[in-house]
Design a protein with these regions (language model features):
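Cytoplasmic helix-loop-helix junction between adjacent transmembrane helices
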Residues: 139-177
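Helix-loop-helix hairpin linking two adjacent transmembrane segments in secondary transporters
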Residues: 178-197
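Extracellular/periplasmic helix-loop-helix junction of adjacent transmembrane segments
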Residues: 37-65, 112-118, 128-131
C-alpha cells in the first residue's frame, strides 16, 4: 500500500511540473504578442508610433523588474498555491484589460462607436491615440506585475514538491517553457492575429 501511495505522489509531482511548464510557456507567449503584432496589426490600426511601442515595452520591463522584488515575498506570505493563484490572477486580469482598451478609450474621449474612433481626424485623432496608448500601457503594467510571480512561484513549487535529487531536472523542465514559448510565439501569434482580425 505504501508503494502505491509513493508512486501516486511521484506521478503527481510530474503532473505539477507539466503544469508549471505550460504556465511558463503561456507566460512567454504573452510577452511576445506585442512585438509580433505591433508592425502589421496594432500600430496601423491605432496609428501608434515606434515611440509608443518603446514606451509600452519600457513600462512593461520596468514594472516586471520592480514587481520581481515583491512577487517572491507575496508568494512566501500567501503560500505556494494561493501565491501562484494570485500571480496568475493578476496576469490574467492584465491580459483581459488589453481587450478593454478600445472601449475605455471610447468612454474617455466620448465617441460612440469604433467607426467614429477610426474616422477621427486632427486633434481628436491625436487625443484618441494618446489616450489609447496610456490604457494599453496600463494593461501591460498589470500584466507585468502578474507575470513576475511565475518564476518565484514555480521555484517554490519545485522546492516543496520535489526531492533534492529531482529538483534541478524539474526546474529545467518548467524553465524550458520560457524558450518554447519564445520559439512557438512567432509561429502562432501572427497566424492567430490574422485569423481574428
Amino acid at each position: 500500500m505504501n508503494n502505491i501511495h509513493t508512486t501516486r505522489k511521484a506521478n503527481f509531482r510530474w503532473v505539477i511540473c507539466a503544469i508549471l511548464f505550460f504556465a511558463t510557456t503561456v507566460n512567454y507567449l504573452d510577452r511576445q504578442a506585442l512585438s509580433l503584432t505591433w508592425k502589421d496589426f496594432i500600430a496601423p490600426e491605432f496609428h501608434w508610433t515606434n515611440t509608443d511601442y518603446g514606451n509600452i515595452a519600457a513600462a512593461f520591463s520596468i514594472m516586471y523588474a520592480i514587481a520581481n522584488f515583491f512577487s517572491g515575498r507575496i508568494i512566501d506570505w500567501l503560500g505556494t498555491r494561493r501565491g501562484y493563484l494570485w500571480a496568475i490572477g493578476v496576469w490574467s486580469a492584465g491580459a483581459c484589460l488589453h481587450a478593454l482598451c478600445g472601449w475605455a478609450t471610447e468612454q474617455w474621449v466620448g465617441l460612440d462607436d469604433a467607426a467614429q474612433l477610426v474616422g477621427a481626424a486632427g486633434d481628436v485623432a491625436a487625443t484618441v491615440s494618446m489616450v489609447s496608448v496610456w490604457f494599453f500601457l496600463a494593461a501591460r503594467v498589470v500584466l507585468a506585475a502578474g507575470e513576475s510571480g511565475n518564476f518565484p512561484a514555480a521555484v517554490k513549487v519545485t522546492a516543496e514538491y520535489f526531492p533534492k535529487k529531482d529538483r534541478a531536472f524539474a526546474t529545467a523542465i518548467f524553465n524550458a517553457g520560457a524558450t518554447i514559448g519564445a520559439l512557438v510565439a512567432p509561429l502562432c501569434i501572427p497566424t492567430l492575429a490574422r485569423y481574428f482580425k
